[in-house]
Design a protein with these regions (language model features):
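Positively charged, low-complexity terminal tracts
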Residues: 1-85, 93, 100-114
C-alpha cells in the first residue's frame, strides 16, 4: 500500500511555524500537522479520515499520551465496533475494512513514528 503525498501548507506567526501535509493511502486521507514553537517545543498531530462511501471501513486515530511510563507514547489505534447480525458478504466487508486499516496503520507507523 502506497502513501501518496498530495499537498503541503505552512504558516508562521509570532509564536512559531506550522505545517500541514496531506496524504492519501488506500481509502483514507491523512493530515500530518506539525507545530514548531519559538520556545523550542514541538507538537505533532495526525487527522485520518476514512472514505465514507466504503462500507465498514473503521476510523483510525492518532494517540499521543504524555502520561504513560515513558512520557511520550505515540501510536495509531483502530476503532472497533459491533455491527450485530450481518450476512456473510457483509462480514467479509468488515474483515476487508479491518485488514486495510491495519495495513494503513503499519505504513503510517513506519513512515512517521519509527
Amino acid at each position: 500500500m502506497e502513501l501518496r503525498f498530495i499537498e503541503h501548507k505552512e504558516a508562521q506567526d509570532e509564536r512559531g511555524k506550522y505545517t500541514r501535509d496531506e496524504y492519501r493511502i488506500g481509502n483514507y486521507v491523512v493530515f500530518r500537522e506539525l507545530s514548531v514553537y519559538n520556545t523550542g517545543s514541538t507538537f505533532e498531530n495526525f487527522g485520518i479520515r476514512a472514505n465514507r462511501e466504503v462500507d465498514f471501513l473503521p476510523d483510525i486515530y492518532y494517540n499521543y499520551n504524555l502520561f504513560d511510563d515513558d512520557g511520550r507514547t505515540r501510536e495509531f489505534k483502530i476503532q472497533t465496533t459491533s455491527y450485530g447480525s450481518l450476512y456473510p458478504n457483509e462480514i467479509q466487508q468488515v474483515i476487508d475494512g479491518y485488514k486495510e486499516a491495519v495495513e494503513v496503520v503499519n505504513v503510517l507507523t513506519d513512515k512517521f513514528l519509527k
